Design a protein with these regions (language model features):
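A short, charged/proline- and glycine-enriched loop
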Residues: 1-2
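C-terminal cap of thioredoxin/glutaredoxin-like
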Residues: 5, 11-31, 99-102, 110-212
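Structural alpha/beta surface segment adjacent to cysteine/selenocysteine redox centers
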Residues: 10, 16-115, 198-212
Length: 212
């Protein structure tokens, strides 16, 4: 059985779509998914990147594209009342659902639906309280243990080369993005391409120029 780690932040519409698409994509395969929440902003800061919603033309395109993708894949999705928003409270809830900070699929789904269903305010305090009551948390979401677990999850992801969400890891290989799901499935089905040198050969390509 393959163990797949799904790195996600609920702020990402692509992570939500990948989450919803994953069971169908992996149908017929023998696997276990570990859902690991990370702070997307922490990944961006570490790698010196801007998020797609921080570049105005890209922000508009992102929202158009994810709505089209949801429509095309038959996934229920509405943009939240505002985006980007601060996902920390939600991430701490999902971490607090399990003593090790690793939620099951049910909890992860509830958090994603909180954000991406209904077009509501993801940070609304009353909605957050309702969600907290529903999840029956194992840890105090506002306590130091949860805060440290989220930091540790993010640092662990960075140490493995994760730079964005969603990222799926299996056998030490990283598959980034919703559009990488077919590539992941091909790997799990032992596609012959992965037995070649192409995966590692890209690391040998020299940088021709760099921005100053």
């Amino acid at each position: 059985m393959k163990h797949i780690t799904f790195y996600f932040d609920v702020i990402s519409p692509y992570a939500y779509l990948a989450f919803e698409r994953l069971p169908a994509a992996l149908e017929g395969l023998y696997y276990k998914v570990i859902y690991q929440p990370v702070l997307f902003a922490g990944l961006l800061k570490h790698h010196g990147q801007l998020g797609p919603a921080e570049i105005e033309p890209k922000r508009a395109w992102t929202y158009r594209q994810v709505q089209w993708l949801a429509h095309d894949m038959g996934i229920d999705m509405q943009l939240p009342a505002s985006h980007p928003f601060n996902p920390l409270a939600l991430l701490r809830l999902v971490v607090a659902s399990n003593p090790k900070g690793l939620p099951n699929r049910y909890v992860t789904e509830k958090l994603f639906h909180h954000v991406w269903h209904g077009g509501l305010d993801a940070e609304d305090l009353q909605r957050l309280q309702t969600l907290m009551d529903l999840l029956k948390l194992a840890l105090n979401p506002n306590g130091p243990e949860v805060k440290e677990l989220l930091k540790a999850h993010t640092k662990a992801a960075i140490s493995k080369g994760v730079f964005g969400v969603p990222t799926l890891e299996v056998d030490g290989k990283l598959f980034f993005g919703l559009d990488a799901l077919p590539m992941l499935v091909a790997y799990l089905k032992q596609d012959a391409w992965f037995a070649g040198s192409a995966w590692n050969d890209v690391l040998k390509i020299p940088v021709g120029t760099a921005r100053q």
